[in-house]
Amino acid sequence: MTTRYIFVTGGVVSSLGKGIAAASLAAILEARGLNVTIMKLDPYINVDPGTMSPTQHGEVFVTEDGAETDLDLGHYERFIRTKMNRRNNFTTGRIYEEVISKERRGDYLGATIQVIPHITNAIKEKVLAGGEGHDVAIVEIGGTVGDIESLPFLESIRQLGSELGRERTLFMHLTLVPFLGAAGEIKTKPTQHSVKELRSIGIAPDVLVCRGDRAIPANEKAKISLFCNVEERAVISLKDVDSIYKIPALLRSQGLDDLVIKRFNLTCNEADLSEWENVIYQEANPNGEVTIGMVGKYIELPDAYKSVNEALKHAGLKNRVTVNIKYIDSQTVEAKGEEVLQGLDGILVPGGFGERGVEGKIFAAKFARENNLPYFGICLGMQVALIEFARHVAGLEGAHSTEFNPQTPYPVVGLITEWINEEGDVETRHESSDLGGTMRLGAQLCHLKEGTKAAVAYDSATCVERHRHRYEVNNNYIDRLEKAGLVFSGLSSDRKLIEMIELPNHPWFVASQFHPEFTSTPRDGHALFEGFIAASYAYQKRDID
């Protein structure tokens, strides 16, 4: 299969939405019957985002094969059916790590290692490997043209453009076309300078996607075309919209996909965007609304919970309700208690690491349990629900996770290597997909207990979901917690690890060790989120009635 490559760059300012634009174009091409994948090349020195602060970088998106990647890969999976993997995202740090490792092994036979050709060759190899087996591979270059960090990536795609030829490569550049209120006009000069910068390093853009708060008039498009040496029909206006899921139709209406198909000399069907039209209709025509309190520790940057935010919206689409998310700092819950949890239709406690704010999350789980308020716990959200139940229902006063209190008298949650069995020995359990010894990453099978809310929601005896955690439920406390009324509704593939818990006599008190948000999409939703939002809407209606 001959793969065609679309390289997406950005200029003028950051945060223009390259990832959304790339994913939207991919969605149109997929709707035309093409097999499409998307890659993200990140210029930072970190090897991967796994240890980066969520408040600086946003969430870490976990792929099926266990790669910790940029949140843009979440956008890609929500827009197209292709599943991402570790080949879809790599960083400067990863490239340098691999090149230096090869140099230490002597793979370069004593050659002087340089950015060109060794680093650029390594980048090109990864791009070509990532696109293998697909009709079209869209490659997003992180950062902004002009950044020193991006230069090796830009040089690499310049070389690929030359080596593969025009019939297999296309360069798409996103720029900002601002409207100056004082002057009352659109300004194209920033775009002209950005294209000049790009051309100075040997890349001539074939398509310009011009971002702004309004549509660009035809005369301004003609001006941009003239000064940037781009066909007028290849100057695409991408104005701000109230829903990112409108963007595929917006790009389609301006013929961007036709331009790509013609450039690559492909023969394919017209785009069928009916699924996206249905999503937009559902979003625009809700029958009600719910307010969900998200109790977390990274709430100053909503992108830290990007996939959770989107999954809640998807569940709203399926239930025909608008989901309003109220972000609540778990430390504020510690300070003010019930006061900040009033007026909610449901509580969601997402994943997280570290001790800060954990007692606030435990309090939120207790509040939901005692008030029959729908509760959904994810990863740490399941662990705090378990800790709360152990303390206040099962009589295990002082129960905790060894992550937060290594001296707890009742370690109901701990590292899998920390369990002490009845003989007093340290018990070690792991699954073949464990990485790094203690972190469970990637998609794994879960067995669901018949008749539970989890099994009913999935309408299946099993599910496959993605993990990202180090700590597990301590199996030594399962019997005692079950006798107190807790239901362990999900077990790992070997049935040795707890994956889900729930309360039977509660409208919706369900929690999972895995991260279901990573597999939710606007077209398909996700069973657990849909069940949670349905229960939250029913709770609200009960109050009204």
Curated annotation (Swiss-Prot):
Gene3D superfamilies, per database record: 3.40.50.880, P-loop containing nucleotide triphosphate hydrolases
Record flagged with keyword Nucleotide-binding: yes
Chain ranges of the Glutamine amidotransferase type-1 domain: 291-542
A single Gene Ontology CC term: cytosol
Chain positions recorded as Mg(2+) binding sites: D72, E140
InterPro entries assigned: Class_I_gatase-like, CTP_synthase, CTP_synthase_N, GATASE, GATase1_CTP_Synthase, P-loop_NTPase
Top EC class, one word: ligase
Positions with a binding annotation for CTP: S14, D147, I148, E149, K187, T188, K189, P190, T191, Q192, K223
UniProt pathway: Pyrimidine metabolism; CTP biosynthesis via de novo pathway; CTP from UDP: step 2/2
Binding annotation for ATP: S15, L16, G17, K18, G19, I20, D72, K239, D240, V241
Annotated keywords: ATP-binding, Glutamine amidotransferase, Ligase, Magnesium, Metal-binding, Nucleotide-binding, Pyrimidine biosynthesis
Chemical reaction(s) catalysed: UTP + L-glutamine + ATP + H2O = CTP + L-glutamate + ADP + phosphate + 2 H(+); L-glutamine + H2O = L-glutamate + NH4(+); UTP + NH4(+) + ATP = CTP + ADP + phosphate + 2 H(+)
Binding positions (L-glutamine): G352, L380, G381, M382, Q383, E403, R470
One GO process term, biological-process aspect: pyrimidine nucleobase biosynthetic process
Residues given in the record as UTP binding sites: S14, K187, T188, K189, P190, T191, Q192, K223
Activity regulation summary: Allosterically activated by GTP, when glutamine is the substrate; GTP has no effect on the reaction when ammonia is the substrate. The allosteric effector GTP functions by stabilizing the protein conformation that binds the tetrahedral intermediate(s) formed during glutamine hydrolysis. Inhibited by the product CTP, via allosteric rather than competitive inhibition.
Region (Amidoligase domain): 1-266
Subunit structure, interactors included: Homotetramer.
Additional facts recorded: CTPSs have evolved a hybrid strategy for distinguishing between UTP and CTP. The overlapping regions of the product feedback inhibitory and substrate sites recognize a common feature in both compounds, the triphosphate moiety. To differentiate isosteric substrate and product pyrimidine rings, an additional pocket far from the expected kinase/ligase catalytic site, specifically recognizes the cytosine and ribose portions of the product inhibitor.
Known role: Catalyzes the ATP-dependent amination of UTP to CTP with either L-glutamine or ammonia as the source of nitrogen. Regulates intracellular CTP levels through interactions with the four ribonucleotide triphosphates.
Family: Belongs to the CTP synthase family.
NCBIfam families from the UniProt entry: PRK05380.1, PyrG
Name of the molecule in the record: CTP synthase
Lineage: Bacteria, Pseudomonadati, Pseudomonadota, Gammaproteobacteria, Alteromonadales
